[in-house]
């Protein structure tokens, strides 16, 4: 959504000599929040500034995002505006982007494209060797997208 943007940073290493030597490690996860009662332009500025900070902190080689679908929802325009800010910041850092549909993420992590959110979250915890499901949901979703990019590479 627009009020909360989840992020998840992982380190992925492919071992060319050993098919089973690939590894993935959690760096961090969290959310960027923009309070609902704040004027739109300030919310977009917060998103812009905070996303720059996250990118500078983790210096990613690749960014994976969820594909945006237009629903008949009143917040579609707001989400599209936030997405524009996200793409702008990623472009300013010259970062390659991969996008995945929700069904691709579910299929990759849970084994089928209509999996429940809880099944995907449990898969995230398992793949990252965590004894807990990352919270909030937006951060767990971001980690699911990051893992999907890793598995699809």
Predicted regions and their residues:
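Phosphate- and other anionic-substrate recognition elements at nucleic-acid/protein interfaces
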Residues: 2-153
């Amino acid at each position: 959504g627009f009020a909360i943007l989840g992020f998840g940073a992982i380190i992925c290493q492919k071992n060319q000599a050993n098919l089973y030597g690939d590894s993935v490690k959690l760096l961090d996860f969290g959310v960027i929040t923009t309070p609902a009662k704040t004027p739109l332009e300030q919310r977009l500025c917060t998103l812009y500034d905070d996303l720059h900070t996250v990118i500078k902190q983790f210096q990613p080689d690749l960014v994976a995002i969820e594909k945006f679908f237009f629903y008949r929802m009143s917040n579609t325009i707001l989400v599209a505006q936030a997405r524009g800010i996200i793409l702008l910041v990623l472009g300013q850092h010259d970062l390659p982007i991969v996008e995945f549909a929700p069904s691709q993420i579910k299929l990759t992590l849970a084994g089928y494209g209509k999996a429940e959110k809880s099944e995907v979250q449990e898969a995230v915890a398992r793949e990252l060797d965590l004894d807990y499901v990352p919270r909030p949901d937006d951060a767990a979703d971001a980690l699911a997208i990051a893992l999907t990019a890793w598995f699809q590479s």
